Amino acid sequence: MSTVLKMEHIEKVYGNQVRALHDISLEVSAGEFVAVIGPSGSGKSTLLRTVNQLVVPSGGHVYIDGEEVTGASGKKLRLLRRKVGMIFQHYNLVQRLSVMQNVLHGRLGYMSALDGMLGNYTEEDKRKAIDLLQEIEMGDRLYNRASDLSGGQKQRVGIAKAIMQEPKLLLCDEPIASLDPNASKIIMDLIYQMTQRRNIACIINLHQLDVAMRYATRIIGLAKGEMIFDGTPQQLNNAVIEKIYNTSMENLIIKQGENYA
């Protein structure tokens, strides 16, 4: 499988000398479904944001599809960001626009600024958007405003928007943190199925350890900005869990279940 993402010795230190990431190195191949776990403040969100330079690392190198992202700016950075879709916890939709318009926004990186402002999407783009909305079972809501949707529906639209970008890598930052268990399962199923069908690499930050173990082909564990674990769900034993979270796997899953109650 081809390498989509390569990170070498990534460091991130904020101005107040807080170390968010230390010596993170990893590679992710096409089609991998990688869950990043760890307690709050472990560096999960910072790690994802260094990939597309929403957070600029203090040291190290990031490569997307063989091209270095670190230090890139202007047109080069925009071109590289086309290859990376992102799904956020809080949906990142334009609430006053329709579902269809929000999904079409996934094509803005391929358009001129003027065409983007005027909404001059191609007929092919419109057909792709409709097909994606059918795939996420939102085809009957094309012209509903995003503000009229439930949280789970908004996240489905966010997924379609990210896939509309035709990325090689999808970054998902706590996409089910605000959802109930039923909506969470729908969202996780969609992210997994849609990336697997298209051979898109996916890195997803999760607080829910049981969810990570159910879906991921690979799990990365962070604690205090350092990589503690990188392996398969089957290799994630109680000793590793205690090192990452400072508690047992059983206690962690019970506590997470109580948060859903």
PLM region spans:
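Catalytic Walker B motif of ABC-type/P-loop ATPase nucleotide-binding domains
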Residues: L170-D173
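Helix N-cap at the start of a conserved alpha-helix in ABC-type nucleotide-binding domains
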Residues: P181-A183
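Conserved ABC ATPase "signature" region
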Residues: E68, G116-D140
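The feature captures the beta-strand-to-loop junction immediately N-terminal to the Walker
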Residues: I37-P39
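Conserved ABC ATPase signature
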Residues: R145-L149, Q153
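Conserved catalytic motifs of ABC-family nucleotide-binding domains
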Residues: E166
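Helix-to-loop junction immediately C-terminal to a conserved catalytic motif
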Residues: N52
